[in-house]
């Protein structure tokens, strides 16, 4: 269970660290795990052991450090809850863009809230349909592209706010040496309050340099080719 990934993603999303630190963390995991283990990591944002991701994104407070009574008294405004949904999308895009297994704790895809055990174990209920649909689109895109699941990975930062993840398969073998469909994708995440330009070195995927602009507080996955690109 890749809790270090959760901690790093949360720190970036909350503005406690920057894209350079997150890039270095992702490279560190890539370098320190054998490939079969690395591509099997359970990349999670929530579980029964921690506060739910939407709740965590509503505050910079370490909820696990609070007493049970203090946790029960926590409350958030509608604006905080709405902003947390948008930030969760950025975390989810990263979760689905990196090597490993994107693991969703039940209800997180619906925007369920909850502090620590037992308050994070409430019965499942439907909530934010838009968030559910966003997760469904991420899952469909990853399922339809071998490069996004078992392709090679390159991590880059365009600025303190913009993280980039290049995933690719050259030829007919993936990163584990198994037969796979070739392809190249670039995930770009901008946590900043303003749109940002970026340039990514995609030469490892045979796609040269790729430049673009990403809207404020948003993420996109570009499909790359040697001739051009499309989202």
PLM regions with names:
Residues 1-117, 187-196:
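Conserved alpha/beta catalytic core and glycan-binding cleft of carbohydrate-active enzymes
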Residues 201-210:
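Solvent-exposed beta-hairpin/edge-strand motifs
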Residues 78-83, 123-129:
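Short, contiguous acidic/charged loop-to-helix segments that flank catalytic cores in large enzymes
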Residues 210-231:
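C-terminal beta-strand-rich structural cap/linker in extracellular carbohydrate-active enzymes
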Residues 130, 156-201:
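Carbohydrate-binding surface patches
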Residues 39, 86-89, 132-136, 182, ...:
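Feature representing long, continuous alpha-helical segments
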Residues 124-158, 218:
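Aromatic- and carboxylate-lined catalytic core of secreted/periplasmic carbohydrate-active enzymes
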Residues 117-123:
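Acyl/amide activation-and-transfer machinery of modular secondary-metabolite enzymes
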């Amino acid at each position: 269970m890749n809790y270090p990934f959760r901690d790093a993603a949360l720190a970036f999303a909350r503005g406690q660290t920057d894209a350079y630190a997150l890039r270095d963390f992702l490279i560190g995991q890539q370098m320190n795990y054998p490939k079969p283990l690395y591509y099997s990591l359970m990349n999670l944002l929530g579980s029964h052991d921690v506060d739910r991701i939407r709740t965590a994104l509503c505050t910079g407070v370490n909820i696990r450090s609070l007493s049970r009574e203090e946790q029960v008294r926590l409350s958030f405004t509608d604006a905080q809850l709405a902003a947390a949904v948008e930030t969760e999308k950025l975390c989810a895009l990263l979760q689905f863009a990196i090597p490993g297994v994107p693991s969703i704790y039940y209800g997180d895809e619906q925007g369920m809230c909850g502090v620590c055990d037992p308050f994070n174990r409430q019965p499942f209920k439907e909530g934010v349909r838009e968030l559910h649909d966003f997760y469904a689109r991420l899952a469909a895109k990853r399922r339809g592209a071998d490069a996004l699941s078992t392709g090679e990975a390159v991590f880059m930062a365009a600025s303190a706010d913009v993280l980039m993840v290049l995933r690719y398969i050259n030829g007919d073998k993936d990163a584990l040496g198994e037969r796979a469909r070739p392809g190249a994708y670039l995930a770009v995440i901008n946590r900043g309050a303003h749109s940002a330009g970026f340039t990514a070195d995609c030469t490892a995927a045979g796609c040269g340099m790729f430049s673009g602009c990403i809207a404020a507080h948003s993420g996109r996955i570009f499909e790359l080719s040697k001739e051009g690109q499309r989202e």
